[in-house]
């Protein structure tokens, strides 16, 4: 797998879960002899919602909610076959979305 690159994008609502998952991926890749670039923190997406609390009138009474989506990027340069096998066997947290691309 010479001149290959594995790019891993992680998304999660909880920053602790995503940091724990990135640490596991980086540790696994380094243990198998691959060179790792990252984790690179990407911009956090903040979605805000405003909801009227009153069912009929009184527009001044509102609640505001926010969802934050945290993202990380990891590049694994020159992965070995052991690296790919170890990453496939890796069990990550349930709240983390993983996208893997080969380049």
From Swiss-Prot:
Keyword list, A-Z: Ribonucleoprotein, Ribosomal protein
SMART domains linked: Ribosomal_S10
A GO molecular-function descriptor: structural constituent of ribosome
Gene Ontology biological process terms, A to Z: translation
Coiled-coil boundaries: none
S-S bridge residues: none
One Gene Ontology cellular component annotation held by this UniProt entry: ribonucleoprotein complex
Transmembrane segments: none
Gene3D superfamilies: Ribosomal protein S10 domain
InterPro entries membership: Ribosomal_uS10, Ribosomal_uS10_CS, Ribosomal_uS10_dom, Ribosomal_uS10_dom_sf
Annotated family: Belongs to the universal ribosomal protein uS10 family.
Subunit-level organization: Part of the 30S ribosomal subunit.
Family annotation (HAMAP family): Ribosomal_uS10
Function recorded in the entry: Involved in the binding of tRNA to the ribosomes.
Protein name from the UniProt record: Small ribosomal subunit protein uS10
Organism per entry: Photobacterium profundum (strain SS9)
């Amino acid at each position: 797998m010479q001149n290959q690159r594995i790019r891993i994008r992680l998304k999660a609502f909880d920053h602790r879960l995503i940091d724990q998952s990135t640490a596991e991926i980086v540790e696994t890749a380094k243990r198998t002899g691959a060179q790792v670039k990252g984790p690179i923190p990407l911009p956090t997406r903040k979605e805000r919602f405003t909801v009227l609390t009153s069912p009929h009138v009184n527009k001044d009474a509102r609640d505001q909610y926010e969802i934050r989506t945290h993202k990380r990027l990891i590049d694994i340069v020159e992965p070995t076959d052991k690296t790919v096998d170890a990453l496939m066997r890796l069990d990550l947290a349930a709240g983390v979305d993983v996208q893997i691309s080969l380049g």
